[in-house]
Regions:
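N-terminal amphipathic/basic-hydrophobic helices that include classical n-h-c signal peptides
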Residues: 1-8
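Active-site catalytic microenvironments in core metabolic enzymes, especially phosphate/sugar-handling
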Residues: 9-239
Length: 239
C-alpha cells in the first residue's frame, strides 16, 4: 500500500530535522538508523509513503515522480550483510538514479502518541483510553467485546483474517497491543492482567504461553498492523 502526498517545497535536511524532532527519534535505541538513509535531491515536494522500502514501493515512487520515500522499514539493519549486492544493490541504485530521498523511522514511528503505528491501530480498532505501558513499546486500552468480536474488528481493519488463540466467547475488557513482530512482548500484557494481546506475528511457543496465562492472543500480520504510521506521518507533513 502506498500513499502519495504533495507538500510545499522543503529542503531534504530540514525535513529530516523536523521529523527527527517530531518523532523524538534521538531517544530510541534501534536496530537501524532512523532518519535520512539515502540522500536524493535537495528540494522535496512530492512524498510517497509505505511500510517497507522494497523494490515494488521504490518503483511506485519512481512512477509517481516522488522526491522522497517515507517508510517504516528501511535499510542498514543491525546484523545484515553490509555489502551492496543483489536486491539491496538494485533498490539503492534505483533510489540514487532517480534522486529520491529515503527516510526511514522504525521504533519512533511505532511509539509516537499521534501518528505512531500503535496509536493509529488503536484508533481504527476503537480501543478506548490507549496508553503506553511504562517505558515499553506495548500499549494498553479498553474494549467491551467478546474475543470473536475483537477478532472481527481486527479483520475489518486489516482486510485479512487474523490468527486467533483463545475462547471465542471470552470477554475482553483490557487489551494490550504492539504492532509488528512483538510476540515476545506478550509478557508485558500478562503483567498488567490484559485479557487479550494483539500483535503482528506469532511464534511456535506463544499459543501455549498465552493459554497457560489465561490471555487471548491475536496475530494480525506484521505488515497489516504497520500500514498506518508512515501514512499518518506523511499526512501530518502536509500541514
Amino acid at each position: 500500500l502506498t500513499n502519495s502526498t504533495q507538500h510545499k517545497m522543503i529542503n531534504n535536511k530540514t525535513l529530516e530535522q523536523y521529523i527527527n524532532q517530531y518523532l523524538n527519534a534521538a531517544n530510541f535505541s534501534d536496530y537501524c538508523p532512523n532518519g535520512l538513509q539515502v540522500e536524493g535531491k535537495a528540494e522535496i515536494c512530492n512524498i510517497v509513503s509505505g511500510v517497507s522500502a522494497n523494490q515494488a514501493l521504490i518503483d511506485q515512487a519512481i512512477d509517481e515522480k516522488a522526491d522522497a520515500l517515507l517508510v517504516h522499514h528501511g535499510f542498514f539493519w543491525k546484523g545484515e550483510d553490509q555489502v551492496l549486492t543483489g536486491i539491496k544493490k538494485n533498490r539503492i541504485k534505483a533510489l540514487l538514479k532517480n534522486d529520491i530521498n529515503l527516510y526511514a523511522y522504525h521504533l519512533p514511528l511505532d511509539a509516537h502518541p499521534v501518528v505512531g503505528n500503535n496509536m493509529q491501530l488503536a484508533m481504527r480498532l476503537n480501543i478506548q483510553n490507549p496508553t503506553p505501558i511504562g517505558d515499553t513499546l506495548v500499549w494498553r486500552g479498553e474494549v467491551n467485546a467478546s474475543l470473536s468480536e475483537v477478532a472481527q474488528s481486527v479483520m475489518n481493519v486489516t482486510a485479512r483474517a487474523p490468527q486467533v488463540f483463545g475462547k471465542k466467547h471470552a470477554q475482553v475488557q483490557t487489551v494490550a497491543w504492539c504492532s509488528g513482530g512483538a510476540q515476545s512482548y506478550l509478557k508485558h500484557a500478562i503483567d498488567i492482567g490484559a485479557d487479550c494481546f494483539i500483535t503482528g506475528e506469532v511464534s511456535e511457543q506463544i499459543p501455549a504461553i498465552a493459554k497457560e496465562n489465561n490471555i487471548a492472543f491475536i496475530a494480525a500480520g506484521h505488515h497489516a498492523t504497520e500500514r498506518y504510521g508512515a501514512k499518518a506521518l506523511a499526512k501530518h507533513l502536509e500541514c
